């Protein structure tokens, strides 16, 4: 184990091991009898002591001793000396067991339990820990127990931080000491303790960890701490609104279900059978408290008092990055309305980490309500024809600039300086896998903080090349680098209105839907969706995607092309269940049904048992098929599709096609063929 060769046992060692096993079986048999019969005599307790001296991992024996201690304490007078004597004996047994096996979970847990009784000297525990940590300075059990002991004392976190200094300077490879340092610093920084202001302390910590990284570059401990520091540098405590739809200054056209005959408007057109459209707020971190009291709406659109805001994707959750409310309109009442949204003017929006949203934002858009011209033709959506070039004057991309500039007003100066210093430092580091990865992360961090359009995006080519190098150097982590490469590429695409507009089109056959083409790019992950909330038609075909995670935020999405990817099951499409506007879905030529064992199926938010499946007519008529295709059933029943393509998958066939037509009754087109009766 851990690269150490296993040598054959000598005959005398095997004989000793066999004798120990016989003794252990005898002790275990006697012990279990005592435990079963609840015998807590001195002899029975001594027997458990002998058992634990041989096998400190006998967890049942530790539990037995807890019961025995409680029994003995209940039988004596409340004399502190007698209580201490009983508990001190337990500490002695634990210490003996730890000398046998320093990594015994049961022994450390039992010692915590004894100490929590409050009759033992905490000072003795710290002295004992120092002895143990000299034997094994990296043992995480001891460090975990140390944190527990320190909480029971008046020892300051600053003193403990100094202790980690000493342990790290003695051994840079002490991962547990680095971890404890991050725990202590997190607490001290959160308290704004004297001498622990982030803009001063974090740059100092970068200098501290450099000693470890450049002295022992092949050891991972310092690198992990550096990654933690980078996270602290990037994370702004106060949550920020990163995007919204509609965006500030935009105009949208609203109608009922159907078409706007001859519509050539460059405004975003939204057609809805329900007579409502989504308002989307996207925060940089999960927040709660988004409600009609914290987000106010001024509009002449009737029936929108007390709007209900829901978190996406989980309605049962109290926090999310994405919040959606639906604003009602009457398509039979054509008119133009100004809508003003104020976010955070009243307190109440709070991040999952407990920080208040204190960057109020106001945006105004115009809603043009039009009559609907019913279209009796249910034409098939083509992904090759009917597209027009993007109008550079469109205001749909306003939010890319507006909110970026607003958030740039936050105090990022010291953070930018820290990142710049690290980029300069690691830019001269000799080539190594971890060095290249760290430099790529630092350059991504620098891009995240840039607000000046003149310099924004200049590092992406270098970042992409670094991940290309890593994929070639380190095949065992290829998929991770591939995913990071995809995320960096999408950040590059969405970094400016100019770069994003190169991938945008209008689909004239459906009210000039906004179409984003990201096909044939070898993407394996979806990212930057906060910049794509206005997209209605998305082409992700001919990539290497395994799931649709992230697309749940794109509430306007009505057409999605995922053909020729690497999707292995319908559970990988689970996020689409929250995109209620989706009408056209192409998942042809994927790997659905190809793998007999697919663990991703269990990521799907499925019913707890088959008895909860198929309570509708389809489930009652075909319970066997619902059970067989339960993940497809769960996803498809939540969608309102009119066009679906599944050809080229292992699952495709007459049986599954028949099942789909029953599950999605409004489906008109299946694999390019029009459903009979339509």
Curated annotation (Swiss-Prot):
GO BP terms, alphabetized: protein geranylgeranylation
Activity regulation as described: The enzymatic reaction requires the aid of the Rab escort protein REP.
PROSITE patterns xref list: LRR (PS51450), PFTA (PS51147)
Ranges of the PFTA repeats in the UniProt entry: 40-74, 86-120, 121-155, 156-190, 201-235
Keywords from the named record: Leucine-rich repeat, Prenyltransferase, Repeat, Transferase
Family note: Belongs to the protein prenyltransferase subunit alpha family.
Assembly with partners or alone: Heterotrimer composed of the alpha subunit RGTA, the beta subunit RGTB and REP; within this trimer, RGTA and RGTB form the catalytic component, while REP mediates peptide substrate binding.
Protein name per its UniProtKB record: Geranylgeranyl transferase type-2 subunit alpha 1
Lineage: Eukaryota, Viridiplantae, Streptophyta, Embryophyta, Tracheophyta
Gene that encodes the chain: RGTA1
């Amino acid at each position: 184990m851990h690269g150490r060769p296993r040598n054959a046992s000598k005959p005398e060692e095997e004989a000793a091991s066999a004798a120990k096993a016989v003794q252990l079986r005898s002790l275990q048999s006697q012990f279990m009898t005592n435990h079963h019969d609840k015998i807590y005599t001195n002899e029975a307790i001594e027997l458990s002591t002998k058992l634990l001296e041989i096998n400190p991992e006998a967890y049942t024996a530790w539990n037995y001793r807890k019961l025995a201690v409680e029994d003995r304490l209940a039988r004596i007078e409340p004399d502190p000396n007698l209580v201490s004597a009983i508990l001190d004996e337990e500490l002695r047994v634990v210490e003996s067991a730890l000398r046998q096996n320093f990594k015994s979970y049961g022994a450390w847990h039992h010692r915590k339990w004894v100490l929590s009784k409050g009759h033992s000297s905490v000072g003795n525990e710290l002295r004992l820990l120092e002895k143990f940590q000299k034997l094994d300075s990296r043992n995480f059990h001891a460090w975990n127990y140390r944190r527990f002991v320190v909480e029971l004392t008046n020892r300051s976190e600053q003193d403990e931080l100094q202790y980690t200094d000493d342990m790290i300077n003695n051994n840079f490879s002490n991962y547990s000491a680095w971890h404890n340092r991050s725990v202590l610093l997190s607490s001290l920084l959160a308290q704004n303790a004297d001498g622990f202001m982030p803009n001063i302390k974090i740059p100092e910590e970068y200098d501290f960890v450099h000693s470890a990284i450049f002295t022992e570059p092949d050891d991972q401990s310092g690198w992990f701490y550096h990654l933690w520091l980078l996270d602290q540098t990037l994370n702004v405590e106060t949550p920020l609104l990163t995007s919204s739809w509609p965006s500030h200054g935009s105009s949208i056209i609203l109608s009922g279900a159907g078409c706007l005959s001859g519509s050539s408007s460059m405004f975003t057109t939204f057609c809805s059978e329900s007579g409502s459209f989504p308002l989307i707020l996207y925060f940089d971190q999960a927040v709660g408290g988004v409600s009609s009291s914290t987000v106010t709406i001024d509009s002449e659109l009737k029936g929108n008092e007390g709007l209900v805001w829901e978190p996406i994707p989980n309605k049962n959750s109290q926090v999310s990055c994405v919040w959606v409310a639906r604003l009602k309109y009457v398509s039979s009442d054509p008119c133009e309305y100004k809508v003003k949204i104020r976010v955070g003017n009243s307190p109440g929006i709070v991040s999952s980490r407990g920080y208040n949203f204190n960057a109020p934002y106001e945006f105004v858009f115009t809603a043009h309500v039009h009559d609907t011209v019913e279209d009796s033709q249910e034409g098939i959506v083509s992904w090759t024809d009917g597209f027009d070039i993007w109008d550079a004057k469109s205001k749909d991309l306003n939010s890319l600039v507006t909110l970026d500039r607003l958030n740039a007003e936050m105090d990022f100066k010291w953070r930018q300086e820290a990142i710049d210093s690290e980029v300069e430092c690691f830019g001269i580091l000799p080539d190594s896998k971890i060095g290249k990865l760290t430099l790529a992360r630092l350059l991504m961090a620098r891009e995240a903080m840039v607000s000046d359009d003149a310099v924004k995006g200049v590092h992406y080519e270098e970042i992409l090349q670094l991940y290309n190098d890593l994929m070639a150097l380190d095949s065992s982590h290829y998929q991770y680098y591939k995913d990071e490469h995809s995320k960096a590429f999408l950040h590059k695409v969405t970094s400016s209105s100019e770069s994003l507009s190169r991938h945008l089109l209008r689909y004239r056959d459906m009210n000039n839907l906004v179409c984003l083409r990201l096909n044939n790019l070898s993407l394996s992950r979806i990212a930057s969706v906060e910049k794509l909330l206005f997209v209605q038609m998305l082409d992700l075909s001919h990539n290497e995607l395994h799931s649709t995670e992230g697309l749940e935020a794109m509430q306007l999405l009505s057409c999605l092309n995922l053909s020729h990817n690497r999707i292995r099951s319908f559970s990988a499409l689970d996020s689409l269940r929250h995109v209620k506007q989706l009408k056209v879905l192409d998942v042809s030529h994927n790997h659905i049904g190809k793998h007999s064992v697919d663990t991703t199926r269990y990521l799907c938010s499925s019913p707890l048992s088959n008895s909860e499946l198929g309570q509708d007519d389809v489930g009652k008529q075909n319970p066997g098929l619902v059970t067989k295709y339960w993940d497809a059933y769960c996803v498809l029943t939540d969608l309102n599709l009119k066009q679906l393509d599944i050809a080229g998958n292992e699952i495709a066939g007459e049986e599954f096609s028949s099942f789909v037509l029953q599950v999605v009754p409004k489906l008109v087109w299946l694999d390019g063929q029009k459903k009979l009766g339509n």
